[in-house]
Each structure stands twice: as structure tokens, then as C-alpha cells.
Amino acid sequence: MFKFDNLILASSSKQRLCLLNQLGVLPGEIVIPNIDESPLKKELPKIYSMRVAKEKVIKVSLLYPKRFILGADTVVCCGRKILPKAETEDQAFEILELISGRRHRVYTSVYLYVPGKKLHYRNVMTVVKIKRLSVKEINSYILSGEWKGKAGACNIQGNAGKFVISMNGSYSSVIGLPLYETYSILSQYFPI
């Protein structure tokens, strides 16, 4: 693993750091970009994901204009409805009930700020189908607490993985950072 002192990860996500480490990359610093992540009125999920990821990177780049900034955002949606990160057990139950037995889309956008105001980005869509969940399964999963802070209230690396019937797209993107796309951007500037 190589530490790149001039690379900042603009994220509070432990999963994103772990995925970045899988590429052999250790950022010099992690900065949490405190931005408003509320969707705009009638904003489509893909556009939302791209906007939020870009805003994270730009916010941190204003503090560190001479460093590379990597940021990402993941959003889960059913149709055009953006599903929030559940904040309560009741909200998690509603989200899980909504995606139960259905296909839903996961968009992850990744941005790299390059000193000099250049931005590179990629957006990845993955379609995930979850089995029809019983009330007992939903309640059991909620008790695990794994839904906290997760887009769509699902942690497919944990207990929710057993509910996934199919996935068409990038597994790492669903977790929070599309590895292939991130590698293709970073490898232009870093020896990875």
C-alpha cells in the first residue's frame, strides 16, 4: 500500500476508505465535507449523486487547493424516488418494506479534483434485486443496527447480503466506491 500525502479523501465513510485501500492507496488525509445533502425538488437520482459528490470535492478543494481531492456519493432509488439514509428504526422499516421483492437502482458518483481546477468524474449505476422480506426478517435486520448510515438502509457487506437475489453492475459501487472507475481516474495521476 502506498501513502499519497497529496491526496485527500473527502468522506466520512469507513467503507470508502477500505475500498480505496483495496486499490493500494492510502490518502494523506481524510477530511469530512460538511455539506447539505438534501435532494433538490424533482432532482433525479443520478443527477443528485453527481451533484453531491462534486459538492463534497469542491468544498474540500477550497480548503486545500493544491492537493488532489477524491470524493464520492451513493444513492439508492426506487423509480425516481431517492431513498434516504434511515435515521430511525421506523424509517428503516419503511425503506426495507419499499425495496422488498423489487429491483432498485444504486448510483455512485466519484469525483477527483486535480489542482488547477480540473475535475474528473465517473458515475456507475447498479441494479439490485432484494428478495421479498417478511416482517420478521425486516425486524431482525433492524435489530442488527446495520442499516444505520446506509443508503437505502442496506448493508450488503453484512446481514443484508443474504437478501440479495441479483446484482447487475458494480458490487464495490454499491458499497460506496466503484473500484474500476476510481482506479481509472487515479491511475492518471498516481502510480497505482
UniProtKB/Swiss-Prot annotation:
**An annotated Gene Ontology molecular function:** nucleoside triphosphate diphosphatase activity
Cofactor(s) the protein needs: a divalent metal cation
Do you know which InterPro entries this protein is assigned to?
A: ITPase-like_fam, Maf-like
UniProt-listed Gene3D superfamilies: 3.90.950.10
Q: What Gene Ontology terms describe where this protein resides (cellular component)?
A: cytoplasm
What GO biological process terms does the UniProt entry carry, in alphabetical order? nucleotide metabolic process
The yes or no answer to whether the keyword rRNA processing is present is no
Q: What reaction does this enzyme carry out catalytically?
A: a ribonucleoside 5'-triphosphate + H2O = a ribonucleoside 5'-phosphate + diphosphate + H(+); a 2'-deoxyribonucleoside 5'-triphosphate + H2O = a 2'-deoxyribonucleoside 5'-phosphate + diphosphate + H(+)
Kindly report the protein's main subcellular placement as a broad class.
Answer: cytoplasm
**Which family would the database say this protein is a member of?**
Belongs to the Maf family.
Q: What is this protein called?
A: Nucleoside triphosphate pyrophosphatase
Q: Name the lineage.
A: Bacteria, Pseudomonadati, Pseudomonadota, Alphaproteobacteria, Rickettsiales
